[in-house]
Amino acid sequence: MTQRDSTGIEPKISVELVDDLRAADLSDLCDAAELAITDGGGFGWLAPPPRDVLEAYWRGVLLIPERDLLIGRLDDVIAGSCQLLRPTRNNEAQSFSCNLTTHFVAPWARGHGLSAELIRAAEDRAIETDF
């Protein structure tokens, strides 16, 4: 269920598959990730890494052919993400499967259905890519 803000207006949520991040989007993604990590939902990190490490991580994700980065926005600001991870070509034994990883939503954006939309978009992408 989507919560309305104090003005009674329902926030706008959107999810998109990205293959490039503008500087402002990279900054928003790092901000959201840092808050999620601090809140305990840090997809492996116990404390936020230095900002340059986090930026390098997200840039690196975009370079890996087996990873699809989906970002979630709340009122046009990146507030979360998830990745669809396909097996590498040499992993024939698991060529039929893919995994969802690094799924998070910043604490300030929770309660609006963004997490569910990220999962739905990842499932749709898995189907589109024959998984």
Which stretches of residues belong to each language-model region?
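Glycine-rich phosphate-binding loop
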Residues: 109-113
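Short, low-complexity, intrinsically disordered N-terminal peptides in bacterial proteins
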Residues: 1-14
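Acetyl-CoA-dependent GNAT
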Residues: 11, 16-96, 101-102, 106-108, ...
